[in-house]
Amino acid sequence: MMDGFAQDWPTLTHTDNGLAMDQLGVGVGVGDLPIDAGFEPQTRARSNTWPCPRPDNFVEPVDELDSTKASNQQLAPGDSQQAIQNANAAKKNSSRRNAWGNLSYADLITHAIGSATDKRLTLSQIYEWMVQNVPYFKDKGDSNSSAGWKNSIRHNLSLHNRFMRVQNEGTGKSSWWMLNPEAKPGKSVRRRAASMETSRYEKRRGRAKKRVEALRQAGVVGLNDATPSPSSSVSEGLDHFPESPLHSGGGFQLSPDFRQRASSNASSCGRLSPIRAQDLEPDWGFPGVDYQNTTMTQALEELTGSMADELTLCTQQQQQGFSAASGLPTQPPPPPYQPPQPQQQQQQGQQPSPYALNGPTPGYNTLQPQSQCLLHRSLNCSCLHNARDGLSPNSVTTTMSPAYPNSEPSSDSLNTYSNVVLDGPADTAALLVQQQQQLATNLEGQCLEVLNSEAQPIDEFNLENFPVGNLECNVEELLQQEMSYGGLLDINIPLASVNTNLVNSGAPISNITTSTGTSLNLNQLQAQLHQQQQQQQQLQQQQQQQQHQQHQQQQLLLNNNNNTSSSSLELATQTPSTNLNARVQYSQPSVVTSPPSWVH
């Protein structure tokens, strides 16, 4: 049985176009095989939906055209036949082909409405016209097979601008559909037309690129003549800024590593990154400034703005006014913060800093100490001597102000700047923020010190020890304010407007000229002040009398309590023994006198 399998099996031959495959030989390559031209790969159409597109070189036969015209002539009698023939001739070369011919749903609806006598039809009348006049829809009038094409008709009525809806006059009736006379004639634009017409889109895109390249080679800065449509990506090769206010020096190229966005309408020239190709290096050798990271600058500007609104004290040379309510000098807010400038620019033109007293602001490598006390306005103030120890960025030395013994400790950063060596603008900005915060804290503390300190009487006021400067006092406003309080507040006026020569010479002072130019008699002022002092003294005497009376009443109460306690003690010690016996006898009934249980 096994010998039967050892026999030679017949060789099978496969013929391809009448040629046996075993006769080709083993060494013949695949490329040498004779292949029929019909087996070559065919180009796939854009859409495989029905109906299939016809070949490009296809020519319609004459009988088909005649039959199409004959079928279209049945659509509408009279004048509509010529319109249908013109539409067929216009759409003969169109790629949109339907089962009923070259006409679309919109064209059929247009002919249906145009064939009516009053040029208007309802939706049901349009359905009826389709079934009666179009052969394709004659057998599709039932509800099962008409759902698709009726839905298409409703969509075309709603989406096309050539149709307009008119409300029916009767109640409960459907609306009329009419042709819009304001609609543009010709082929209606579909929503996907821009994305489907790829050939026109590519041609337009290529023309835009060529135009940009020509302008770039010619060195033209303005692109006013280049106005392509919004759908074309004009900016894909555009890396110039023609009319930007930030780049008035002319058009310049962007960084070569800048990657434009993909072909989209959002990639316009106004949305490219405005970064130069070269780095921004300052002349003094510091690294380039990142303009996108401006949080520190914005924080400094907000800090200085808030300080200008909240603080009324600043470090200027002269004071502009005097407040009688608080006794502190008030000045206008400091100017806005300016970033530090290099030493070369400061040597060319130096301007006084809002935070310095005796000269221009030095560079940000060193900070000079102040030469005058900010609050006491004295060159020989002891605050300056105590504050010479220096200020480090990590530690702040607190001292007591000698002028106010009952005050809280305050920081030395209000009185002096330390000689701190900085490395760059970042350290300067950080130190400025720290000093401004310390300045606000110290000013608040010293304001409380002045308010809590006891006011000096007018008779103990010494003009020689008071550092008289260019202080101005509006005496009229001060008196009006004090009179409004009813004369119950103490007044402490530094005679700042008095001429220092008259004070030193000892000449009598009769009049004071205020800042408004009016003259005020000193005698009247002293009389008013004396009257206020008398009223205050009377008020103090009344308070002292009340306190004395209260003290006397308390003493009387204490004496009465002592007398009552001593009399009770005497009565207790002088009671006879009979009373004691009586009290004992009175308390005896409460004692249990019954015999014990074991007694019989």
Swiss-Prot record:
Q: Molecular function (GO) terms listed?
A: DNA-binding transcription factor activity; DNA-binding transcription factor activity, RNA polymerase II-specific; RNA polymerase II cis-regulatory region sequence-specific DNA binding
Compositional bias of kind Pro residues: 330-342
Does this UniProt record's set of keywords contain Cytoplasm?
Answer: yes
Q: Which PROSITE patterns does the record match to this protein?
A: FORK_HEAD_2, FORK_HEAD_3
Q: What does the entry give for GO biological process?
A: cell differentiation; glucose homeostasis; negative regulation of cell growth; negative regulation of cell population proliferation; negative regulation of insulin receptor signaling pathway; regulation of DNA-templated transcription; regulation of lipid metabolic process
Q: Which residues bind DNA?
A: 100-206
Positions of region (Disordered):
187-210, 222-283, 319-364, 580-600
Which ranges does the record mark as transmembrane? none
Alphabetized CDD domains for the sequence? FH_FOXO
Which region is the signal sequence?
none
Q: What keywords are annotated for this sequence in UniProt?
A: Activator, Cell cycle, Cytoplasm, Developmental protein, Differentiation, DNA-binding, Growth regulation, Nucleus, Phosphoprotein, Transcription, Transcription regulation
Location of Phosphothreonine modifications: 49
Q: Where is the composition biased (Low complexity)?
A: 343-354
Q: List the InterPro entries hit by this protein, alphabetically.
A: Fork_head_dom, TF_fork_head_CS_2, WH-like_DNA-bd_sf, WH_DNA-bd_sf
- The principal localisation class reads cytoplasm
What GO cellular component is one of the record's annotations? Answer: cytoplasm
Q: List, as start-end ranges, the regions of compositional bias called Polar residues.
A: 226-235, 261-270
The listed locations are:
Cytoplasm; Nucleus
Please list the residues that carry the modification Phosphoserine. 80, 195, 264, 267-268, 273
Complex and partners:
Interacts with melt.
What is the recorded function of this protein according to its Swiss-Prot or TrEMBL entry?
Answer: Transcription factor involved in the regulation of the insulin signaling pathway. Consistently activates both the downstream target Thor\d4EBP and the feedback control target InR. Involved in negative regulation of the cell cycle, modulating cell growth and proliferation. In response to cellular stresses, such as nutrient deprivation or increased levels of reactive oxygen species, foxo is activated and inhibits growth through the action of target genes such as Thor.
Protein name (database record): Forkhead box protein O
Say which species the protein is native to: Drosophila ananassae (Fruit fly)
